[in-house]
From Swiss-Prot:
PANTHER family: V-TYPE PROTON ATPASE SUBUNIT A (PTHR11629:SF63), VACUOLAR PROTON ATPASES (PTHR11629)
Spans traversing the lipid bilayer: 312-332, 360-380, 453-473, 485-505, 520-540, 556-576, 593-613
Residues forming coiled coils: none
GO biological process: vacuolar acidification
Species whose genome carries this gene: Chlamydia trachomatis serovar D (strain ATCC VR-885 / DSM 19411 / UW-3/Cx)
Main localisation: membrane
Keyword Zinc carried by entry: no
Protein name: V-type ATP synthase subunit I
Bilayer topology annotation: Multi-pass membrane protein
Keyword Lyase part of the UniProt annotation: no
Family from the record: Belongs to the V-ATPase 116 kDa subunit family.
Location within or outside the cell: Cell membrane
The entry's keywords: Cell membrane, Hydrogen ion transport, Ion transport, Membrane, Transmembrane, Transmembrane helix, Transport
Amino acid sequence: MRVDVDKYLFIGREKSEFFSACREIGAVEFLSKSKLKDSEKVRKLSEGLKVLNLLTKSCSPADLVSTKSGYLVTEQLLQEIFDLNQEITTLTESLKALGKEIVRVKPLGDFSSEEIRELTLKTGLAVRFLYKRHIEGAPLEVEEENVFYLATAYNYDYYAVIGIVSLSKDIFTEIEAPRSVNELREEEGHLQALLRKKKARVCELYAYREDLLEALCEQCNEQSLQHAEVSAEDLFDDKVFSALGWVIVDRLDEVKKLCDSLGIYLERVQPDPDEVIPTYLENHGLGALGESLVNIYDTPASTDKDPSLWVFFSFFVFFSMIINDAGYGLVFLATSLFLSFKARKQIKRSIALKRFLQMFMILGLGCVCWGGATTSFFGVSVSYTSPFREYSLTHFLALKKAEYYLKERPKGYKELVHDYPILKEKKTPKEFLLAQSTSSGDSVYKAVVYDKFIDNILMEIALLVGVVHLSLGMLRYCRQRYSSIGWVIFMCGAYMYLPIYLQAVSLIHYALHIPYELGGLVGYYVAFIGLGVAILGGVIQRGLRGLDEITAVIQVFSDVLSYLRLYALSLAGAMVGNTVMVMSERFSPAVGILIIIFGHTVNIALSIMGGVIHGLRLNFIEWYHYSFDGGGKLLHPLKKVICQKSQNL
């Protein structure tokens, strides 16, 4: 629900007390010429928390310490966190470099760098190391005195040289080795021990994380209060202040009571002509879930009706139709219940996580219901006579259509009988519907009529959902756009007329029993009446410029046809699921299970992407076009954040 917001002027003396009290109420956003910027303390605390969270990721849950080892003031704690981060980063980089050095000098073997230095001092002979490219079959030893073969590694031959020898620089390359591999490994062990010690200290500091959260919360509260106080203008040598603010209308009585207690004068003022009035949404339950979806795309304008519930229910229907699989719905439902149980502590501290799991659970339930209505379960081919199919929505509608075909014998019936002569013998709707035959180029017997009817029904349901969805949006916004009523009438008329034009049978004929010819004739005239009403509404609202409303007929048609994506995406997912099951039957059970798991995992991921993207797109693009202004900004009232140590910031 969108709550109105009005602009008020506040004048009084008790400045600090007034703003502190307003913060407790949380019903006023004060207007300020400057944007709220984080103070140095807030930035430092935020950075400290980020660093601590990043560092503690390397700690296992068992290593995290929950008991404090002593008292630390916030400044000391932050400084130690930053120092540890720097030291751990330095040690990690040193270990990486040391590891590369060990790999480089490993072929030289174990030696003492100290003994080599003593040998050089006593004899004046330098000990050097060289390497050359290894040639298969070539002798490893070199016919030079004081040149000793050490090893072959990495496709190179390594040598030690004592004193001065004449070796070709084109073949041999000197390698610097100030320390041997055993000395490097000794240093590596020392650094690793030091790194473990630093990480252990990080695990101990995890016990102070709640203190940092509380300190950050307090600083944010203090910062927002100071910013609000700065927005006020001081008058009469700072004895009186004045401030402008947006007040939530439903909370106006609380604000007036506060002002009376502090002797503050308040007066409603008109917003500036170019001023954007903030939008305040207040939703609970399913409306709160819808509000989360609405905020993904745009903020409603202050003149918009709150679309939260509409968007949620529409998204629920679209997502269920796109997934179109009861098995996948059970997976979503089971996963959401499992995560809700495992993350029950986090749910208490995170509203976003709680809403996400609730939405996931509801969407899973919707997928189960729609998948059951269309007899779709993990892509498994269900028998035409299965009870699971007989009690489904699509089977019921298909029987109704078959009954209509046998009774009225429309053009579609004649075409089917021509293509499949066996249908002439069928007298009952069920026999006609389940008659099996082979398609051209196919040797498998299938209930061809049944499959055709189901495809047509699902496609028409998608279009019908589009007409209903757009009509609801237009009617919801008809006070702001008079032509909307005409377009609703036009869509209803077009829906009745087009089956006649296409010589097809529609749901309205066999399910709603609307006469075929009469319904088409009425629809033809209703469509033109609706077009005229739309143009008339545009002229009444916008004068002669409203005549361009006739061009919107293309937009309306394209928007309705856009809902065919519901059918197309569901069909694609069903085909992939069925293909996975067919492929798994060609292999052994072990391989088949792997194919099923992998194939359905990929299909679920793609289906979720399609359901989310296109389910939201139909709301935000097609539906918003007729029932939403947008371009608003959310109201951010001065409000005290409750500083609880268990609060997830």
